[in-house]
Amino acid sequence: MGSGDWDEIKRLAADFQKAQLTSTLQKLSERNCVEIVTLLLEKQMLEVVFTNDGKEYITPDHLEREIQDELYVNGGRANLVEVSKTLNVDLSRIEVLAERIAAENPSVHLVLGQLIDEDYISHIAQEINEKLVLRGEISISELASQFDLPSDFLQHDVVEKHLGKIIKGRQDASNPRVFFTQAYIQRCKAKIRGALAAITRPINVAVILQQIGVQEKIFHSLLDEIAPAGQVTSKLANSQYVPLIYAKTQADWVNSFYKQNSFLEYDAIQKLGISDAKSYIRKQFPNEEFLFLKRVALGARLVELTVVTALNECSATKQYLDLTTILPSNLSEEDIEEVFSTIMGQKHSNPNNFVYLDSIVFSQPYLAQLVQPCQALAESQAKAAVDGGVYQQYIVEKTLAQKGSVSTQELEDDGKVDKRDERRKKASSGKAGGGAQGRETKTKSTKKHQRGKAAAHNDSDDEDDVQQSSRGGGAGNKKAMKPLELVKTADIVKLITASLEEEGLEHLAKPISALYTNQFNQTALARAQELFEATPQTNRRQTHAAIQDRINTFLIDIRLYEKGLKLFPLETQTQLVKYLLKSLGNDICNELSLYVAGECNLTVKNTNLNVDQRIKLAQECEVQYRASLLEQNKALNKTIDEFELATETVLKACSMIIKKVDKKKDRLLIADHKKKLQNQLLECQEPALLLHLAVLILFTTITGSILHASGKFVSAILQHIRGSLNDEQNALLLRYHDLVLQVLQATPDSSESKVANEHLQAMQVQVVELAQNFSRASVFKADC
């Protein structure tokens, strides 16, 4: 056997021995491995974390090591979302392990879903230090924006933790979120000190900061350390820096001006750059007292030693004082007047002793002596007014005006309320209607047009009727009568001008006269009253004649109105007669009752009397008047003839006569009445009153008679005149009448009322034209 064979035998023996010594290796299939792991998991003998695709799993400890590896690989800052994507593990598992890592390791922080270790914090601390050295100042808000980290984390765990170590700087005491270097503070101090040293006039702090590039908060914090030669007005946005040299110049100018003039002008102080002049004056002169006016401030010494002293002397000598001679020439007339008013408003002053006019102060005794000649003027004017009858005429007109201006509230009493209730009952029962399908138009009554000097008084028929004056061509309520002017301003001017010219004050003659015109006019009126009362017989005769004329005018009116109302049916006639007597008849009773009261020396407070008041007054009169007055009051509820007979009896008792009737003037009076109605119609804008006026005009045109009727008779008048109008005219008036009723019955702000008013406005011109242009010829043509 050769050597080669022996070597082969040794090799085979070695392989066999190796096979004997090696244990048998058993291989498991993948399925067996899965079953084994599942069993271990079920028995909680093993804990693993599956990947998102479920094909792999890993133990939590190994996953924790891989998360730490990712933190290291990313430079000490790892986003858990990115780690979850990289490791292919659910984010919730990553977050749980990240919290455990941060809890177990103090050098690792979990911040807003990110793991950050101390190495990264040291790195950004170095970056912050480099930036701070470069800029000199940084804020936490800037760092939070740069590093995308919470500001609290940056402040406490990064900046403050490494402040003085890695970060070379200091924290702002006023704002802990700001950090700066000492070199930056020194540069800011140098800039501020240099800028303030160069300023010589007040300048806005914002302008300074803009020029030197320093933040406002640092400026105010370093200002006290710098101790500049000036002061900042405030720490607000609009604050100013005022150099001491400028403030000293201001103070020197103000002190010098006040020392020379004893007053200070606000405008002059404001031109120095001082906004609140009054406060500055108080601060600059703490021991001085000032009189602060609208435009200037006067020193108390100037006021007391000059003005007050001069006023006292003026009062004692009974002269006048020109304030412009004792006050500084810089003061305007408004300033001087304000000085005088302020002094007069003080406790120790008596403004009644002086009169101020155009910078001149007059003492009352001086003016009294100046206008003394006007007393004789008032006496002579009063005598002339009484002798010429001017004052007597004024008394008559004043009495009539007072009657017409008595308010409705003063006229109401219990008896009148009862009558109103009675009228409401009649209206609700339908007795007041008639004509135009029984419609009743509740409108304002037209004016009572009467002839003569007197004006008619207010109607009292309907509470909704608006009663107006009978004279004046459509004028409204009577205005307050002006007092008789016996002494005029021009008269006083003539008397005092000569005296004022001697003093060079003639330009004040008219203002002084205006002050005393009313006083002397009242004196003249009082004297005229004395002279008038001294001649009672003359006064009585004139009053007697005036009332006699008015009563005759009333009776003529009633006669003309009676002709018109007789054209209506009996039932309507009765209502029209009642209305006529309640209005014009009531006025006649009032006139005669007041005259008799005056003859019997009885005092009557209310000149517009009702029936009960007239009965009471008649019972207090003398026997010769009593029976006739009582009978006249009763006749108001009877016929017109009975009322006229009763009135004649009263007139006879009063020694008055009834003028003879002149029927030739009837046509002229009727034409005058119609003309006044037409004038009122042209001025009227209220639909109900416009319809009322139109039908009265048409009635007068058609019948040749006048009618005294309130608004509730409109429907009856329309029914009466419809036969004289064509179909189109009747339709127009009837449509307008229906719309007026619709407006009166609807709520003022309702849509129905607005639509009706629009239609009325559109039809107004046609109704006015019909009333104004309708003529008797049209009536005759219609009849044909």
Curated annotation (Swiss-Prot):
What this chain does, per the entry, is described as: E3 UFM1-protein ligase that mediates ufmylation of target proteins.
Q: Does the record's keyword annotation contain ATP-binding?
A: no
Keywords noted in UniProt: Transferase, Ubl conjugation pathway
Q: Which residues form the signal peptide?
A: none
Q: Could you tell me which cysteines form disulfide bridges?
A: none
Q: Its Gene Ontology biological processes?
A: protein K69-linked ufmylation; regulation of proteasomal ubiquitin-dependent protein catabolic process; response to endoplasmic reticulum stress
**Annotated Gene Ontology MF terms?**
UFM1 ligase activity
Q: Name one GO cellular component term.
A: endoplasmic reticulum membrane
Q: Where is the composition biased (Basic residues)?
A: 444-454
| Record-linked InterPro entries | Ufl1 (IPR018611), Ufl1-like_C (IPR056761), Ufl1_dom (IPR056580), Ufl1_N (IPR056579)
One Pfam annotation reads: UFL1_C
Protein name (database record): E3 UFM1-protein ligase 1 homolog
Similarity comment: Belongs to the UFL1 family.
Residues annotated as region Disordered? Answer: 405-480
Q: What is its EC number?
A: 2.3.2.-
- Class in the EC hierarchy, top level: transferase
